């Protein structure tokens, strides 16, 4: 019974973090993009480990 409780404690945080995003971007080297229209790059580790230009629908 104790092993089941410990296993649940170890496994339960995994789905929570996987559903949110994956912030583990260690060892990845990124550049800084130049976005069209003077937009600032977006930093969202739930989408990408590297900064990226916002979609055109978000620019207007």
UniProtKB/Swiss-Prot annotation:
GO MF terms held by the record: potassium channel regulator activity; sodium channel regulator activity; toxin activity
Signal peptide from the UniProt entry: 1-19
Expression tissues: Expressed by the venom gland.
Identification of the protein by name: Insect toxin mu-NPTX-Nc1a
Summary of the function given for this chain in its UniProt record: Insect-specific toxin. Blocks voltage-gated potassium and sodium channels.
Keywords annotated in UniProt: Disulfide bond, Ion channel impairing toxin, Neurotoxin, Potassium channel impairing toxin, Secreted, Signal, Toxin, Voltage-gated potassium channel impairing toxin, Voltage-gated sodium channel impairing toxin
Entry superkingdom: Eukaryota
ATP-binding keyword on record: no
PTM text: Contains 4 disulfide bonds.
GO CC annotation, single: extracellular region
Organism of origin: Trichonephila clavata (Joro spider)
Subcellular location(s) of the protein: Secreted
Keyword Disulfide bond among UniProt keywords: yes
